[in-house]
A protein has these predicted regions:
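Short beta-edge/loop segments at beta->alpha junctions of small alpha/beta modules
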Residues: 1-50, 147-171, 175
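Hydrophobic/aromatic-lined pockets within catalytic cores
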Residues: 9, 63, 128-131
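A generic structural signal for short, non-catalytic loop/turn and secondary-structure boundary residues
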Residues: 10-11, 67-69, 85-88, 109, ...
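A conserved hydrophobic position in a structured secondary element of the catalytic/binding core
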Residues: 13, 53-54, 118
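Residue-level detector of family-conserved "landmark" positions at structurally sensitive sites
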Residues: 14-15, 69, 137
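N-proximal short alpha-helices
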Residues: 24-27, 31, 89-97, 112
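Exposed, interaction-prone assembly regions rather than primary DNA-binding/catalytic cores
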Residues: 50-102
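Hydrophobic alpha-helical interaction segments
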Residues: 101-177
Length: 177
């Protein structure tokens, strides 16, 4: 592995976690986006169908938070300690959740597809725990942007199923501001 890393064929994300550098980027200072890196690490630990990019990280992938963040959040079936990345000042936080019970969609990244919470699920997650992911200043604006393009019936159904009516009301308040 060390030899492949030295030759620029592998990129080291964190201790024990590497990704293959895309062929057209070999030899450059390429590194994947934080959300992509987090999905890759979580997939290596739990398998690709058992993890979901969520919270502020999902909002970033949905285009609702434009600035880069230093924390990525991933829903996983069992708790795991946070992993500090070695290629940048960032951390991947794992949130134990029933990943099969979350509303998700496939999202294509530079390293392949991953599961990401839908805009509706992301709204509920952000409104429920706005401080998760260390970007609480961005959350109301992100929720408002996602709310504008969300399916309101689906949002109401998810809030009811997941007992997140209070979170939905908070999101609606942010969307009206």
């Amino acid at each position: 592995m060390a030899r492949l890393h030295e030759r620029g064929l592998l990129h080291r994300l964190a201790d024990g976690y590497y990704v293959v550098v895309p062929q057209d980027m070999t030899g450059s200072s390429w590194m994947p986006g934080l959300e992509t890196a987090a999905a890759g690490i979580a997939s290596a630990i739990y398998g690709p169908d058992n993890i979901l990019v969520m919270g502020v990280s999902a909002a970033r992938l949905h285009g609702a938070i434009p600035r880069a963040l230093a924390t990525a959040t991933v829903a996983v079936p069992a708790q795991h300690r946070p992993i500090a990345l070695s290629d940048r000042a960032a951390v991947v936080r794992f949130v134990k959740r029933n990943t099969q019970g979350l509303d998700a969609e496939r999202y294509d990244t530079e390293l392949g597809s991953t599961l990401v919470t839908t805009p509706e699920q992301t709204i509920l997650d952000l409104a429920h725990r706005p401080d998760l992911g260390d970007a609480e200043v961005d959350v109301p604006t992100a929720v408002a942007a996602l709310y504008e393009r969300s399916d309101k019936d689906r949002l109401q159904a998810l809030a009811t199923e997941q007992r997140r009516i209070a979170s939905l009301r908070r999101a609606e308040t942010w969307a009206r501001q």
